[in-house]
Amino acid sequence: MSARQDEDQRLQAQTQAQAQVQAQAPLSLYRERLKIANACQSCRASKVKCDGGRPVCARCQKRGRACSYSQHDAASPRGRGRQRAKAPTRQPRPIRSRASVELPVTAPTPVTAQASPLIAQDYSLQTPSATQTPSTTGFSGSSDLEHVHEDRDESRAFYAAHGRFAGEVSSTIDKMAGLSPDTTCSLVPFVDAPLFGDVGEPPRNVVLDFASDLPRAYADRLLAIYWHHVHPVEPVLDQQQFCRTYDAFYSGSGTPLHVDRDIWLSTLNIVFALAVQIQESIPMQKRDDEANRYFQRAWALLRPEAILWKPGSLELVQCLLLMNRYLHCTNNQQKTSMAATLAIRIAQNMVCHTSEESPSSDADKDLRHKVWASCVALERPALLTGHGSDFHAWELELHEIGTHIQLAQVQSKNSMATKLGLPRLYQQDEYHAIAVQLDGCLNKWEKSLPDDWRLQNMHMIHDRRARAERYLLHFRLLHSRIYLHRPMLARLYAIKSHAPTAAAASDPSTISDRLLQECARMCLEAAQKLTSLIAEIHDPNEPIGILPWWYRVYYLHIAGIHFLAAMFASDLFTPSVERAWYQVLAALRAHEHLSLYVQQCARTFETLAARILNARCLSVNGNGIMALDDGAPGLFLDDMFQDVNFDLDEFLFSVDDTGRRTNY
């Protein structure tokens, strides 16, 4: 008996010793973030690459800026590995990591199992682990969020102009609050915000042939929702031709010989996914699970690794276009850009953008033009292409103006261009005059609209499709105005933040100063109108809104970010702007049931506003202008406006970016 007790004590001692060793052993670390850990405070705030040179990095030395490192960085120049936090008690997470999502295989409706279903191979939606970027909109300090942003430069390779603007606003607010940069995550709709939840990887045994799985009545209902609510704003498909193939497929005769079965089934699944997502009355978790399951089927059926080896077809372009639209509402940025690039290149090879090769009929020619218009719209995900011919003409005109606005803000100077002596398309000091001309073009275009297309006469239109087209056109107009005047809004803060004394601020204002002030106000006025228009079209009692809810969230985010920027100066954050700000918050709260991202976006906005208005984080001079600390960068100072010549080189795009997807 004593021997057994001794043995038990010995085993217990060994167990305790092993437990102590495991407790002392370091937890598994994420890969070293060399770029982020070595970055100086200035480069960290601007979210740009830094070589970590000491005492001055190359970027700061080139621009003559003060270069400083935090004490923690100095103590650990090789970067600090972050330990994986202990898993908390299972609770609903704000936005789950894609790697941890378990997606059910069962369908949302009662199904009948097939005797020998077609089984998909493992076509992964995920990028390699080195580039994975789990998304969230919460704040640092939560155990779920400690490994969110491993490398923002890599994860936002296709960063939109609005996304960069939002990132700079939140970064500056964090700096003013005495927090490290990127304390507040600023995911942006149509860039990296998971509006549709986590798509995740398709199950290994996903059933692809679901003709008998999905009841015909339920499939008819989803298809009807798509034609009535999604197709008017995304006229990618030919309704008559698609319905003929759909009837043949469900009747048992199969798809026609000229139709690629896998591509058509992939398109049908994306149609179902969009039809499910647009239904605002379905609970969020159920809607995401069902829609993402359809999307996973579509991805597996398309077999993306085989697209490059297949001959191009109009059906393939249509499938890629719809897939791109769905991916825009996920955090699969690489897949989004890949789908867009493939669609555009295949359409170009098929000569969809010219009439050199005449199609067999006028209907085919019209369809090709619609598909090409959708390809053009891929450059800006909020560019919704309407269904009517009149709308199509006006939309193309507005798109042309928007293209020139973008060109006026693109950096056309780089090292190679300077070496070759190439002229710049737009000089930096010309943007004021160019903006006036472009604003006149927008006004002229707006005045050319017929009376029944004007915003004040919208209540007279009873046809839902016609109203949707008209509303979308006005959303695009307001967005273009915001985009046009946003650089002047940023420039205004740069000038005020650099004012050395109160006496300098009291000097008589010049014409340029007044122009900047007025353009900033016009930018905020457009954001106010955008907010009011969303409130006008949103009816919480409607199961499906006249505008898809993800577009409403996108425009609310645009308006909210600009209102946050207005809080930096009391002369711009007027009572009317303040009312519009609270209207944005109320509208986001009304959309919280649609996506976890919307819930945390509202909380992020409130937190950022509280930091701006907190007396501990700012000081106000005699003119009501927020004076930033000497060590803190202005809203868009060093990296965006280097001098009084209105340098846009670091603000919106670089030449390399223009080859990618450049959104507003």
UniProtKB/Swiss-Prot annotation:
Annotated DNA-binding residue span(s): 40-67
This protein's GO CC annotations: nucleus
Copy out the induction comment: The promoter contains putative CRE1 binding motifs 5'-SYGGRG-3' and expression is differentially regulated in light and darkness by CRE1. Photoreceptors BLR1 and BLR2 negatively regulate the expression, while ENV1 exerts positive regulation.
Q: Which InterPro entries match?
A: Fungal_SecMet_Regulators (IPR051127), Transcription_factor_dom_fun (IPR007219), Zn2-C6_fun-type_DNA-bd_sf (IPR036864), Zn2Cys6_DnaBD (IPR001138)
The record, for Pfam families, names: Fungal_trans (PF04082), Zn_clus (PF00172)
> Which GO molecular function, any one, fits this protein according to its record?
RNA polymerase II cis-regulatory region sequence-specific DNA binding
Compartment(s) of residence: Nucleus
Name this polypeptide is given? Sorbicillinoid biosynthetic cluster transcription factor sor3
Organism field: Hypocrea jecorina (strain QM6a)
